Amino acid sequence: MTSPSIFVEVPQAQPVLVFKLTADFREDPDPRKVNLGVGAYRTDDCQPWVLPVVRKVEQKIANNSSLNHEYLPILGLAEFRSCASRLALGDDSPALQEKRVGGVQSLGGTGALRIGAEFLSRWYNGTNNKNTPVYVSSPTWENHNGVFSGAGFKDIRSYHYWDATKRGLDLQGFLNDLENAPEFSIFVLHACAHNPTGTDPTPEQWKQIASVMKRRFLFPFFDSAYQGFASGNLDRDAWAVRYFVSEGFELFCAQSFSKNFGLYNERVGNLTVVAKEPDSILRVLSQMQKIVRITWSNPPAQGARIVAFTLSDPGLFKEWTGNVKTMADRILSMRSELRARLEALKTPGTWNHITEQIGMFSFTGLNPKQVEYLVNQKHIYLLPSGRINMCGLTTKNLDYVATSIHEAVTKFQ
């Protein structure tokens, strides 16, 4: 008799919701189907878009006989790390000029978050202090909870962010949570285009947030996944991070180049570290190097080369910013068109929040029954939270989606 597998007691994990949604969409034979769940840019033909500047740089790399496939340094491609941190902080950043900034190339934004979380769990607020509270917004990108718990943090809390009644930022709730958090707590902040709500604090509100965080000795860990992709303006989307640096904060900023370069499967990320003096950066990076060594050891080169080539060449950089604006403008257009159609249909409720939000996602305010109706009856795939990816909308499906939302809201109040 054969003995049972040693893995017989391993339970089946639940699928990752957003990827299951895409799998269900692909298997659906209905010709009307629309995927509003995918977290990637799509053209008006609902196709992935390789940025023209990326195509150009890929060709340059392919034709460069001096490049090879040797290991990159553990911390990554130096030119990429430098360019990425400069993009986040700005060319005129005093922190850069004073050499108190460091970067770690990572496997996407998730990898940057994980390296930062692993470092903080070992060296922040006391050695190996896994009890430091980590605050994530309510709601947030679901991976934030998993990354910090996976790094060993035992006390992950939520802070007020979304006001469902007014469909906007709950600033007072946010500030109250900052005031009541234990000193030295870690706060995960969305640099721009908050996921999933698409609602960001204004500069004045960010100043209030920073003021309380400074007084309470709270540590800002920014997640910057959409720089340039949110408003179409790189500097505007980096405003919050740069303001915190100007206020003297030490901070981490996890950067992703998946969205603004369209390099989803290249996994290009960077963890920017800002400290108070250069010596601290050297020591922090030395410890991060040890963490990277036992995580992925050395990062991949292709995506980092594409980003570094583009950001370091004035002509390519200008072309890239144009490509980014093309994507941002299409999203803004879809927001305006969807709102206009819902208001023309006199769909119950208010829909101004759709155009007031920014970035790839809109937190529609649709309830679970309305979402269930859209998925099961109308073949429009979106998350149970009501979050939709504006890139899934096109001039061809806008009328169908708007009419379907109108039906869902009318049937299920």
UniProtKB/Swiss-Prot annotation:
Q: Cross-referenced InterPro entries, in alphabetical order? A: Aminotransferase_I/II_large (IPR004839), Asp_trans (IPR000796), NHTrfase_class1_PyrdxlP-BS (IPR004838), PyrdxlP-dep_Trfase (IPR015424), PyrdxlP-dep_Trfase_major (IPR015421), PyrdxlP-dep_Trfase_small (IPR015422)
Q: Which residues carry this modification: N6-(pyridoxal phosphate)lysine?
A: 259
- Can you name one GO molecular function term for this protein? pyridoxal phosphate binding
UniProt keyword Transferase present: yes
**Binding positions for L-aspartate per the UniProt entry:** 39, 141, 195, 387
Q: Which Gene3D superfamilies match?
A: Aspartate Aminotransferase, domain 1, Type I PLP-dependent aspartate aminotransferase-like (Major domain)
Q: Give the modified residues of type N-acetylthreonine.
A: 2
Q: Which PROSITE patterns match?
A: AA_TRANSFER_CLASS_1
Q: Which residues carry this modification: Phosphoserine?
A: 149
A Gene Ontology biological process term: glycerol biosynthetic process
- What is its biological role? Biosynthesis of L-glutamate from L-aspartate or L-cysteine. Important regulator of levels of glutamate, the major excitatory neurotransmitter of the vertebrate central nervous system. Acts as a scavenger of glutamate in brain neuroprotection. The aspartate aminotransferase activity is involved in hepatic glucose synthesis during development and in adipocyte glyceroneogenesis. Using L-cysteine as substrate, regulates levels of mercaptopyruvate, an important source of hydrogen sulfide. Mercaptopyruvate is converted into H(2)S via the action of 3-mercaptopyruvate sulfurtransferase (3MST).
- Name of this chain's protein: Aspartate aminotransferase, cytoplasmic
